[in-house]
């Protein structure tokens, strides 16, 4: 099976501070891949390097067969990315933000956006400044999904979402994956990975410590947090 993502010996540092160190992993096309670890483990740095938002020190990254540096703009057209923090102009309406995200890609996503907003119970008539954290997350999810990309990358997508919306969110992921998409889910919530992901990678202190199927032993995983705090 083809790989949607191939990372080889990725290293990224921030001066004297740790980023990621010699990370290598592959994500198969059609996978729901869990990227899990404590906060500060290097998950977001890896994702931003994948998308070309960070210039990494050494290594190579291929996304959908394209080079993450040379083909940066092409990759962004094929990827739906949701960052861990959703920032929008407070004065804009939800509907305006969603339409703007589609217009940037030169696409008409009205029908898909409407379906997503209904599934996520998102009121598009409100202004961003009126929204709770959870509803801002919903806007970010719609912006990442509405163009039906080949690869979804979600960074801590469910924080602030109530249980019903979390369930609906994962139903949407399963729907798109059944149509041929691939999903990377970066999270620190082990239960999400065990319930929804097919495969997973665990990061700690900038290093990939484990690659395994997504049935991860809870005691083993909690030890990473305990060791991190010592």
Model regions: which residues?
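Conserved ABC nucleotide-binding domain
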Residues: 113-130
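Hydrophobic anchor residue at the start of the ABC signature
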Residues: 141
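Catalytic Walker B motif of ABC-type/P-loop ATPase nucleotide-binding domains
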Residues: 152-156
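Helix N-cap at the start of a conserved alpha-helix in ABC-type nucleotide-binding domains
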Residues: 163-165
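H-loop (His-switch) and adjacent beta-strand-loop-beta switch element
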Residues: 200-213
């Amino acid at each position: 099976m083809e790989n949607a993502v191939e990372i080889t010996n990725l290293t990224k540092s921030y001066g004297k501070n740790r980023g990621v160190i010699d990370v290598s992993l592959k994500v198969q096309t059609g996978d729901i891949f869990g990227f899990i670890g404590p906060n500060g483990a290097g998950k977001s740095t890896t994702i931003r390097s994948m998308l070309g938002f960070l210039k990494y020190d050494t290594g190579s990254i291929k996304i959908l067969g394209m080079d993450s540096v040379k083909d940066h703009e092409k990759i962004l057209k094929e990827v739906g990315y949701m960052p861990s923090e959703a920032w929008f102009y407070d004065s804009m309406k939800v509907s305006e933000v969603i339409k703007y995200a589609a217009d940037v890609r030169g696409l008409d996503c009205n029908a898909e956006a409407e379906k997503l907003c209904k599934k996520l119970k998102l009121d598009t008539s409100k202004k961003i400044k009126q929204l709770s954290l959870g509803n801002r997350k919903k806007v970010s999810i719609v912006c990442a999904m509405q163009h039906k990309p080949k690869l979804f990358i979600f960074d801590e997508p469910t924080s602030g979402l109530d249980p019903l919306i979390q369930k609906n969110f994962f139903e949407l992921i399963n729907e798109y994956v059944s149509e041929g998409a691939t999903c990377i889910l970066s999270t620190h919530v082990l239960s999400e990975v065990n319930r929804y992901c097919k495969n997973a990678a665990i990061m700690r202190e900038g290093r990939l410590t484990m690659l395994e199927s997504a049935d991860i032993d809870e005691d083993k995983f909690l030890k990473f947090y305990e060791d991190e705090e010592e």
